[in-house]
From Swiss-Prot:
Superkingdom of source: Bacteria
UniProt cross-references to HAMAP family, sorted A to Z: S_AdoMet_synth1
Name of the molecule in the record: S-adenosylmethionine synthase
InterPro entries (UniProt xref): ADOMET_SYNTHASE_CS, S-AdoMet_synt_C, S-AdoMet_synt_central, S-AdoMet_synt_N, S-AdoMet_synthetase, S-AdoMet_synthetase_sfam
GO biological process: one example: S-adenosylmethionine biosynthetic process
Pathway(s) this gene product operates in, as recorded in its UniProt entry: Amino-acid biosynthesis; S-adenosyl-L-methionine biosynthesis; S-adenosyl-L-methionine from L-methionine: step 1/1
Length: 393
């Protein structure tokens, strides 16, 4: 990639229909884990106007009121009015869960007498990434796209911008100079609003646009990056119908939003609703943990990790490190350090990151990575010092 370029990432709010589905799926996973952390869960959710469908495969000894969990999640997000097209009190909730396939279970449960050699729950490839563009070691475009929709929700919920509704999308286009963030070229923010905020079908009131720019955007983005920034606020002019009424929502449809905003490849596996025996989730978290510690150790300015697995086999097929020429030692040597300092077998990951806990609903909006939440063990940099010492730095 050229040293001077534009790069764009997007995020969506907790009220976006796909994110509503993700949060319900992870709320159900958490509810199950509170009673039975050894459960096997693959909880999928569909949301539409006045309707939630819960389906998937769950094997558990827990007794969970799935319908109530879905309603509570919808209420927390803010869909508490029939005018929004879905209301936690009155929406229909259909439940159609089955148990995990015995064919899968035998590969995961009985791969070895050594529990650390328990096999992966599926084949697949996963990526982790970190870079020095932000203190959180995340790419700047996705990091700030998340913060914009997070602030939209905050101002909606605390009443400072009471005309906002739950659905919103953000997009940040960053200008890079010499390969580093230089300024923000364009910010797009589309936020659902009450009908009386629309002047016409094609034009928003100036006061609404000003409020969004001054109260949501400018407090979030670094002032020095807002040089000649273009602001596109509700470009269609009207955003009243949104959430599950505006679009059908599905679990696992925002995988780029959930990860790095397109700054690195994605293996294709979604996260929400999956217990950590599913390497789609746990190995992606571990790969972020590895990449972040490598950058925090000063071994590279940016780092991409790829891991891959076969179903029923514990050890990854490959662990590949790519630093795009920013590494202070060869990538092959960094990869050898990864093998030495991180246990990337599924059970090893679960132990290393303490993943058999009800911590997942919080991950399901505003990004799984780059957030300093105490539950997000994959964001720790506790291996950085050991990596640096082992590299001889």
């Amino acid at each position: 990639m050229a040293n001077d370029f534009l790069f764009t990432s997007e995020s969506v709010s907790e009220g976006h229909p796909d994110k509503v589905a993700d949060q319900i799926s992870d709320a159900i996973l958490d509810a199950i884990f509170r009673e039975d952390p050894r459960s096997r869960v693959a909880a999928e959710t569909l949301t539409n106007t006045g309707l939630v469908v819960l389906a998937g495969e769950i094997t558990t000894n827990a007794h969970v009121d799935y319908i109530q969990v879905a309603r509570d999640t919808i209420k927390r997000i803010g869909y508490d009015n029939t005018d929004y097209g879905i209301d936690y009190k009155g929406c229909a909730v259909l439940v159609a869960y089955d148990k995990q396939s015995n064919d899968i279970a035998q590969g995961v449960d009985h791969a070895s007498d050594d529990h650390l050699n328990t096999g992966a729950g599926d084949q697949g490839l996963m990526f982790g990434y970190a870079c020095d563009e932000t203190p959180e070691l995340m790419p700047a475009p996705i990091y700030y796209a998340h913060r914009l929709v997070e602030r939209q929700a905050q101002l909606r919920k605390d009443g400072r911008l009471p005309f906002l509704r739950p659905d919103a999308k953000s997009q940040v286009t960053m200008r890079y100079v010499d390969g580093k963030p230089h300024s923000i070229d364009t910010v797009v923010l589309s936020t659902q609003h009450h009908p009386d905020q629309s002047e016409t079908a094609t034009r928003m009131k100036a006061s609404f646009i000003e409020a969004v720019i001054e109260e949501i955007i400018k407090p979030v983005l670094p002032k020095e990056w807002l040089q000649e920034t273009k602001y596109l606020i509700n470009p269609t002019g009207r955003f009243v119908i949104g959430g599950p009424q505006g679009d059908c929502g599905l679990t696992g449809r925002k995988i780029i939003v959930d990860t790095y905003g397109g700054a690195c490849p994605h293996g294709g596996g979604a996260f929400s609703g999956k217990d950590p025996t599913k390497v789609d989730r746990s190995a992606a978290y571990a790969a972020r943990y590895v990449a972040k510690n490598i950058v925090a150790a000063g071994l590279a300015r940016q780092c991409q990790i790829q891991v891959s697995y076969a179903i029923g086999v514990a050890r990854p097929i490959n662990v590949t490190v790519y630093t795009e020429g920013t590494g202070v030692i060869p990538d092959e040597k960094i990869a050898a350090l990864v093998q030495e300092h991180f246990d990337l077998r599924p059970k090893g990951i679960i132990q290393m990151l303490d993943l058999l806990r009800p911590i997942y609903e919080k991950t399901a909006a505003y990004g799984h990575f780059g957030r300093e939440e105490p539950e997000f063990t994959w964001e720790k940099t506790d291996k950085a010092a050991a990596l640096r010492a082992a590299a001889g730095l």
